[in-house]
Amino acid sequence: MDSNTVSSFQVDCFLWHVRKQIVDQELGDAPFLDRLRRDQKSLRGRGSTLGLDIEAATHVGKQIVEKILKEESDEALTMTMASTPASRYITDMTTEELSRDWFMLMPKQKVEGPLCIRIDQAIMDKNIMLKANFSVIFDRLETLISLRAFTEEGAIVGEISPLPSFPGHTIEDVKNAIGVLIGGLEWNDNTVRVSKTLQRFAWGSSNENGGPPLTPKQKRKMARTARSKVRRDKMAD
């Protein structure tokens, strides 16, 4: 096992512990709490994959951080902070929409890279809006927190979320997953639109009809999904 992988996990565990103390003292805002919950799931998955105990890793991570801080000058810390771009947190969804439990009548789940896509196949002939909470850096989507599909009535009918055991994803991973989600919903004659905020930071533009400009790869993937569905329907007949 690579030593850098282990030490990175140990430091992440300790930093999560510090952030948890901030939340316990009611000093964190909603985006801070969202990231804390997401990272908790990620750390559990990484710990299971690496075969490492989180509590023990936290103690070692504390020692690593304390050693670095002891050697770090205030001037070097200031220069590092000034040269590091800050990410922003974008919220399409309210806290209630983000945390609400939802249920599927005809559930379908698909893993697309490091992202999990869930769709309720029972939903038909609805107008659906995709909304997401995510972080942005350099005016581009950095990390997806959660994406959900809402009907006009406010019901949740689809979702894209990072896999806890597979941390890290790219903007292309997110766009590919959105293409799969849209394809799955549109096959049941639903009309799907993407929020202007998500269009702007994921694709760098927005369409009047709310549809994201899919890449040729995404279009081919949707076409393969369509052909597969047609074959299944024929076999069922």
UniProtKB/Swiss-Prot annotation:
One of its GO terms (cellular component) is host cell cytoplasm. Homodimer. Interacts with host TRIM25 (via coiled coil); this interaction specifically inhibits TRIM25 multimerization and TRIM25-mediated RIGI CARD ubiquitination. Interacts with human EIF2AK2/PKR, CPSF4, IVNS1ABP and PABPN1. Inhibits post-transcriptional processing of cellular pre-mRNA, by binding and inhibiting two cellular proteins that are required for the 3'-end processing of cellular pre-mRNAs: the 30 kDa cleavage and polyadenylation specificity factor/CPSF4 and the poly(A)-binding protein 2/PABPN1. In turn, unprocessed 3' end pre-mRNAs accumulate in the host nucleus and are no longer exported to the cytoplasm. Cellular protein synthesis is thereby shut off very early after virus infection. The gene is NS. A motif (Nuclear localization signal) lies at residues 34-38. This is Non-structural protein 1. A motif (Nuclear export signal) lies at residues 137-146. Belongs to the influenza A viruses NS1 family. It comes from the Viruses.
